[in-house]
C-alpha cells in the first residue's frame, strides 16, 4: 500500500472516532418546526421562536414575558414530564400529518405519542398567541431572573 493511501485511511479512522464522540443532535426539532409551520400556516419562520422571551429556545428561567413565552414554558414542562416517563424528547421521532384544519399526531409508541402531543400543543399555542418583536432576543439575565434571585441581587 502506498504511504498516501495510509494517510487517507488514517484520516478517515480519526474522523470516525471523533464523530462517535459527538452527542446526538436534537432530531425532533425538525419535526417540531414542521408542526409549527403547519399550525401557523407558514406566517412566521420557526427561527423567530428560537430566541424569544425567557423560555423559547435553549433553557428557561423566571416568569414568562407574555402568552407566547408561556407556550414555550408549557412545552419545556411537557418535555420534563416526558423525561420522567423515560422518554428522550429531543431525539424521539414521531408520526404526524399536516391537514387543512390543523396538524395531527399519528400512531406510535407511548413516547412518540407523548412527545408529539407536547409539540402539537405548543405549535397550536404559538399559532394563536401574538408575537411581540420587543421580546425577541431579550437580555435574559435582566428580564428572566427568578423572584428569589432578583431579591438577592437588590439586597
Swiss-Prot record:
The lineage of its organism: Eukaryota, Metazoa, Chordata, Craniata, Vertebrata. One of its GO terms (molecular function) is toxin activity. One of its GO terms (cellular component) is extracellular region. The keyword Calcium applies. It comes from Laticauda colubrina (Yellow-lipped sea krait). Keywords: Calcium, Disulfide bond, Hydrolase, Lipid degradation, Lipid metabolism, Metal-binding, Neurotoxin, Presynaptic neurotoxin, Secreted, Signal, Toxin. SUPFAM superfamilies: Phospholipase A2, PLA2 (SSF48619). The active site is at residues 75, 119. This is Basic phospholipase A2 PC9. PROSITE patterns: PA2_ASP, PA2_HIS. It catalyses: a 1,2-diacyl-sn-glycero-3-phosphocholine + H2O = a 1-acyl-sn-glycero-3-phosphocholine + a fatty acid + H(+). Binds 1 Ca(2+) ion.
